[in-house]
């Protein structure tokens, strides 16, 4: 019985992939990935002055990482909103196929799993850019022993934003809801990038990645798992109650 349930969940997850990756979603993903690559290459400054680089190599490496992470997180907000919009638009058509013979909890978990796998591959791609672009561009650049932290912190940030967007999209099932959340998320990131006081405050409660010459940090690392669990449970609860009313 356990094996059959496991296969059923895998099947649902695969089916949701087909709903998630439709033409509009694929276009947004493709354009975003290409733009991220192009902008990260530009941030590496192909026209830098070599003598200046030799004197300020560490500062240039830190600046590259900081600016690249900022751009990556902005594009992640757009990608997450696209996924949330797909969730809102395709929810009824996908759910109606299985509600009569499949638990709502299993349907909901399959959606989360599908999105989590997508985000894993997205963040792997982004971390590869953060490592390979400077490795190719900068003669003195060495792969940091914190590289694994790039992925962990990026994934924590991305999954937190995704679950929050899912929660909002499920509680307020209108197209404009995830778009408003995207706007607020981008505004917070812009303010954090430009105002130190705001960043110091916000980074204590939401996943804002900090970069300096000492390395990369995530001040809210102890708080974020609580938010992820809480928002996941709220999302599951709202989804379950909402379906019961239909």
Regions found by a protein language model. Give the residues of each.
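Secretory targeting signals
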Residues: 26, 32-84, 109-179, 213-220
């Amino acid at each position: 019985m356990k094996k059959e349930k496991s296969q059923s969940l895998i099947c649902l997850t695969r089916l949701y992939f087909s709903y998630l990756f439709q033409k509009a979603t694929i276009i947004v993903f493709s354009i975003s990935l290409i733009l991220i690559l192009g902008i990260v290459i530009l941030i590496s400054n192909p026209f830098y002055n070599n003598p200046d680089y030799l004197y300020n190599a560490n500062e240039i490496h830190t600046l590259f990482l900081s600016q690249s992470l900022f751009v990556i997180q902005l594009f992640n907000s757009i990608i997450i909103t696209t996924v949330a919009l797909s969730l809102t638009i395709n929810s009824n058509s996908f759910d109606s196929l299985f509600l009569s013979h499949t638990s709502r909890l299993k349907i909901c978990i399959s959606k989360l799993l599908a999105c989590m796998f997508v985000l894993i591959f997205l963040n792997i791609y982004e971390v590869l850019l953060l490592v390979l672009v400077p490795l190719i561009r900068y003669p003195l650049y060495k792969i940091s022993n914190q590289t694994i932290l790039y992925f962990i912190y990026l994934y924590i940030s991305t999954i937190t934003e995704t679950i929050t967007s899912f929660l909002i999209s499920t509680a307020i099932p209108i197209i404009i809801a995830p778009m408003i959340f995207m706007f607020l998320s981008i505004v917070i990131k812009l303010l954090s990038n430009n105002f130190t006081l705001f960043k110091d405050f916000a980074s204590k409660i939401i996943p804002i990645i900090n970069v300096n010459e000492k390395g990369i940090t995530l001040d809210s690392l102890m708080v974020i798992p609580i938010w992820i669990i809480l928002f996941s449970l709220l999302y599951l609860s709202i989804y379950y109650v909402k379906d019961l009313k239909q």
